[in-house]
UniProtKB/Swiss-Prot annotation:
Keywords attached to this entry: Aminoacyl-tRNA synthetase, ATP-binding, Cytoplasm, Ligase, Metal-binding, Nucleotide-binding, Protein biosynthesis, Zinc
Gene name in the database record: ileS
GO cellular component terms attached to this protein's record: cytoplasm
Enzyme class name: ligase
Keyword DNA damage recorded: no
Annotated protein name in UniProt: Isoleucine--tRNA ligase
Organism: Sulfurisphaera tokodaii (strain DSM 16993 / JCM 10545 / NBRC 100140 / 7)
Length: 1047
């Protein structure tokens, strides 16, 4: 293995290795023989751009990690990627390319066939580019066989869902109030309305004159003046308290609790509440529409202009408590209107312009007409107040145009009838995290029928034909089925406009049936992926491999793809199509904002993956260590730290590989049984930690918690192996002879590192593949063809792990003590003292005494109970009257006096067991830690550091011998650095030259043999300096000049 970690060159080498050796293809063949299956369906990304967002990369890396892990776990994985290729985003992009301003231009100027071909070309080109990007970051999926919603087989399969809905009596054509984009000229379903903008709109209070009165008015509030021409009735809550308010000889009717706010907003100071009354008194009251003389549609609506009770639909958080209702432009208005038999007046065309029935306003854009409507109200004394409001308003998720609500005829699937089935199926699914279940459950409880039709061009054509003669509806379930009933030839391409020409024979009257012009909701396309992606004979394949074992996407897909899949599954299969759902977070910048080019905070993946400082695995590791379901904040500092961590992991394998190769170590000729007697306690500890981590990782991955896999494995290699175990065993590796002690250490390290390599391979496949090819004996073609390491329970030892954890805590306290005394860790000390509160801890510490000695860098360590600390300290307790008084009342003064006279004894007991007991005036008293302030002073010449289990004591002053050894170790550290600078291999010898201060010359001569053994120097010349590399070093305020030459 190269001694230096170079991410980019390593990754390019591995990409080439995978391609030249057809590793994915071999893996697929190898994996196909496994008995257990793991069916994964890729939530298809939308190819609106040739370069993936870094959030999409996170998504794909999570999927890749899980698929790689499941292969290692012995599952036959289905890893087909997908692309969601239809819909408005691509249409809008092509419209921009072609300079199209309105939908009719596509038909009249471009031609639907040309437009659809352009959309297809755009989708395929971007999908091809995305595929290259995904392969470049090591995503092992079947890229030669992706499913695409534009493929004819996919479209053909998808039709079966609509046919099934029809057969179940769920498919119908009806009128509902839906969001509509006037620019794209198509409807949007509720779940597509997820994007909002802060928009300034009018905020007006309008007076509707009560019929038959001279001066009584109902006051309504609206921010959509354009809906007033379509007003039919007014809604109230009959249980609210309403008021008649006198203003300028007019009586204004509004909710009592809203009077103050309305008057304030309207700037009216002089007003008087004449009377208050329950809303029920208003029910049935008739009014005169203020624009009846200029809006044609208002003629004939007089009998419907009444006040109706809408119950809790009317609130008092804003407005007047009276709500203007236009059933043609409001969903609640529509539902209430349906109950009372009110007509649906819808006055707006597909482009958001008023229809002729709007009278004066015909042809005008509804939002632009607002000011004209306000002026007309003002002229008719119907405007109480006009202002502005900035509020969150829904916009089209692709073109960003403000949406409008329209009552329009569309095709629906009646999923509201399936609510109970859907809720039941949600309970049968594993949700990770479990709040995903709550969120999607809340959606289902509010479910509305699924509007599946869209008035566009680039999409899956609805397979609905209607007979011209008898109106019979024929729903087709596949291409094969269409070919059996078609009078005309079925085109190769099932898209519009070619499918529009297919005529079907009516199965009732024998007449000609023509297809409806609509295409399907784009969420329908992806929602059928669980079966439509399986190609021909999908039903047979589904029986073999269904249901889906896992789907995973961002948390926004709880209302998107997961919801669509659930609906489709229950319609088609009477069950959820998936067994488990994993939700991941969004990718944000360091400030928690979404990443967009317009904000200047957008980072392209290549800025990391092609950066020589980072590379692909750095990005993958950083992404996968983020808690999967939480939002991640992109950070260059975090990437820097990840690179350092990856470098440590690389160096661990370099260390092991180097020494094992030097000693020609072959793990195949050994096993733990014949080496067991030579295992030291640190070896047993490592085996215990390794098997425990493997067990924990497997448990985590049962719930697809990839962040726990990534964090546990990297932490194990960095903290347990690199920073702890290798420190303990390094000298065993330096031993030139092949003694059993060394071989035992090698074997344990090899087994642990090989297993760790396999477990890390789903996270960092490039780095692990490179190491695997050099490090592992009897290797397979690729690390991805290995099997997960087994958990050997017999090696998990709680006792040893607790002992080592205690030794680490003691070492940490020792470091703190050294820092206080200014003694470097490299400088050995003669004695250290460890005093522990618990007898069990004392016993455990003595079991790992040699480890503690090493960690504290001391020649000897004394370990004992906490009472031993008294030899090195003075402690005393001072009374705390503030807590003694309330607890002991009349005994306070006596207890204070007792503490002052027995200060050390009280303090000693409280430190040892948390309390001190005494009898005062015949009453038992327990003095606790809150009753005293404990002051502690370590004896002169010593330094101590407390931790939660005891205290570590070190002598401040070090002997001359200890000082010399410390300086020599500092010199050795500099020499090791210089060896690296000269690229001297670990087994190569050097010639060493040292010029030291005159008073240190004798010291160096005394330590020459030690220096030679530690630096592999054949000769150490003191006094003169020469060599291939000469550097001056300042050590303890003294200058040393060191020269190193290759021997």
């Amino acid at each position: 293995m190269p001694s230096k970690f170079d991410p980019l060159s390593t990754e390019k080498e591995i990409l080439k290795f995978w391609e030249q050796n057809k590793i994915y293809e071999k893996l697929k063949e190898y994996n196909s023989k496994f008995e257990k299956k793991f069916l994964f369906i890729d939530g298809p990304p939308y190819p609106s751009s040739p370069i993936p967002h870094i959030g999409t990369v996170w998504n794909k890396v999570i999927k890749d990690c899980i698929l790689r892990y499941e292969r290692l776990a012995g599952f036959r994985t289905y890893d087909q990627p997908g692309y969601d290729t239809h819909g408005l985003p691509i249409e809008v992009a092509i419209e921009k390319q072609l300079g199209i301003q309105k939908k009719s231009d596509i038909i009249e100027k471009i031609g639907v066939d040309n437009f659809v071909n352009k959309c297809k070309e755009f989708a395929l080109n971007n999908a091809s580019s995305l595929t290259a990007n995904f392969k470049n970051i090591g995503i092992f999926m079947d890229w030669n066989n992706p499913y695409m919603t534009l493929h004819n087989d996919y479209i053909s399969n998808s039709w079966m869902l609509i046919k099934k809905a029809y057969e179940r009596g769920l498919l119908y054509k009806g009128v509902h109030v839906l969001h509509w984009c006037p620019r794209c000229e198509t409807t949007l379903a509720d779940y597509e309305v997820s994007e909002y903008k802060e928009i300034e709109d009018p905020s007006i209070y309008v007076k509707f004159k009560v019929k038959g009165s001279e001066n009584r008015y109902l006051v309504i509030w609206t921010t959509t003046p354009w809906t007033l021409p379509a007003n039919v009735f007014v809604m109230i809550n009959k249980d609210y308290e309403y008021a008649e308010v006198e203003v300028n000889n007019e009586i204004l009717i509004m909710a009592k609790d809203r009077v103050s706010d309305v008057m304030k907003e309207a700037g009216i100071k002089n007003y008087k509440i004449v009377r208050t009354f329950k809303g029920v008194e208003l029910v049935g009251l008739q009014y005169i529409h203020p624009l009846a003389d200029i809006v044609t549609a208002q003629k004939g609506l007089d009998n419907y202009h009444i006040v109706v009770d809408a119950g809790e639909e009317v609130t008092l958080t804003e407005g007047t408590g009276l709500v203007h209702s236009a059933p043609g432009h409001g969903d609640i208005d529509f539902e209430i209107g349906k109950k009372i038999g009110a007509p649906v007046v819808m006055l707006v065309n597909d482009r958001g312009e008023f229809l002729p029935e709007a009278g004066k306003y015909v042809g005008k854009n509804v939002r632009s007409a607002a000011e004209e409507i306000i002026n007309d109200l003002k002229q008719r004394n119907a405007l109480l107040h006009s202002g502005k409001v900035v509020h969150r308003y829904p916009v089209c998720w692709r073109c960003k145009t403000p949406l409008i609500l329209r009552a329009i005829e569309q095709w629906f699937i009646g999923v509201s009838k399936l609510k109970e089935e859907l809720l039941k199926e949600i309970d049968n699914v594993k949700w990770v995290p479990d709040w995903g279940k709550t969120r999607i459950g809340n959606m289902v409880r509010e479910i509305r029928d699924w509007v599946i039709s869209r008035q566009r061009f680039w999409g899956t054509p609805l397979p609905i034909w209607i007979c011209k003669n008898c109106g019979n509806i024929i729903v087709i379930g596949s291409r094969d089925e269409l070919e059996k009933v078609a009078i005309t030839k079925v085109p190769e391409d099932l898209h519009r406009p070619w499918i529009d020409k297919v005529v079907v024979r009516c199965n009732k009257c024998g007449g000609e049936a023509h297809r409806v012009p609509d295409v399907a909701d784009v969420w329908f396309d992806s929602g059928v992926a669980f079966f439509a992606s399986l190609g021909k004979d999908w039903e047979k394949k589904w029986k073999e491999i269904g249901p889906v074992d896992l789907v995973l996407e961002g948390h926004d897909q709880l209302r998107g793809w997961f919801f669509s899949l659930l609906r489709a599954g229950v319609i088609l299969l009477d069950r959820a199509p998936y067994n488990a759902v994993l939700v991941h977070g969004f990718m944000l910048d360091e400030q928690g904002r979404e990443m967009h080019k317009s904000l200047g905070n957008y980072v392209e993946p290549s800025q990391v993956t092609e950066n020589e400082k980072y590379g692909r695995d750095v990005l993958r590791l950083w992404l996968l260590r983020n808690t999967t379901w939480e939002d991640a904040k992109f950070s260059w500092k975090a990437l820097d730290q990840t690179k350092r961590d990856l470098n440590i992991i690389w160096n661990v394998y370099v260390f092991a590989s180097t020494y094992m190769n030097l000693d020609n170590f072959d793990p195949r000729i050994y096993n733990l049984d014949n080496l067991k007697q030579y295992l030291r306690i640190e070896d047993l500890w490592l085996l215990s930690r390794y098997n425990r981590v493997v067990k924990e990782v497997k448990e985590s991955m049962n719930d697809f918690k990839v962040h726990e896999l990534a964090n546990k494995m990297t932490s194990f290699i960095i903290d347990d192996i690199s920073r702890f175990y290798l420190r303990l065993v390094r000298k065993r590796a330096w031993n030139e002879s092949n003694d059993p002690d060394k071989i035992a250490m090698y074997y344990v390290l090899y087994e642990v590192l090989k297993g760790s390599l396999v477990l890390l391979s789903p996270v960092i496949p490039f780095t692990t593949e490179r190491i695997y090819q050099d490090f592992v004996v009897d290797k397979k073609d690729s690390v991805s063809m290995e099997s997960l390491p087994e958990v050997k329970e017999e090696f998990i030892n709680d006792k040893i792990e607790k002992e080592f954890e205690l030794s680490k805590e003691i070492a940490e306290a020792g470091l703190n003590a050294r820092a206080k005394a200014g003694i470097k860790l490299r400088w050995p000390i003669k004695n250290a003292y460890v005093f522990l509160v618990s007898d069990i801890d004392v016993e455990m510490a003595n079991n790992v005494k040699e480890v503690i000695k090493f960690l504290l860098n001391t020649k000897d360590v004394e370990i004992g109970g906490i009472e031993g600390y008294r030899r090195f300290s003075k402690i005393k307790a001072t009374p705390n009257r503030g807590t003694i008084g309330p607890d002991f009342k009349r005994l306070t003064n006596k207890i204070v006096e007792y503490i002052e006279n027995n200060s050390e004894k009280v303090a000693s007991d409280i430190i040892a067991k948390g309390y001190h007991e005494v009898v005062i005036e015949g009453e038992p008293v327990q003095i606790k830690v809150n009753h005293v302030n404990i002051l502690e002073e370590t004896e002169e010449g010593y330094i101590s550091a407390r931790f939660n289990k005891g205290v570590v004591v070190l002598k401040k002053e070090i002997s001359k011998e200890e000082e010399e050894e410390g300086i020599v170790r500092d010199i050795i550290r500099r020499i090791q650095f210089m060896r690296k600078q000269l690229n001297v291999q670990i087994n190569d010898y050097i010639l060493l030259y040292i010029k030291a201060p005159e008073e240190r010359t004798e010291m160096l001569k005394k330590w020459t043999d030690y220096i030679k053994s530690e630096t592999r120097a054949k000769e150490v010349i003191i006094g003169e300096v020469k060599g291939d590399l000469i550097l001056p070093w300042e050590i303890e305020d003294e200058e040393y000049i060191i020269g190193v030459s290759k021997s």
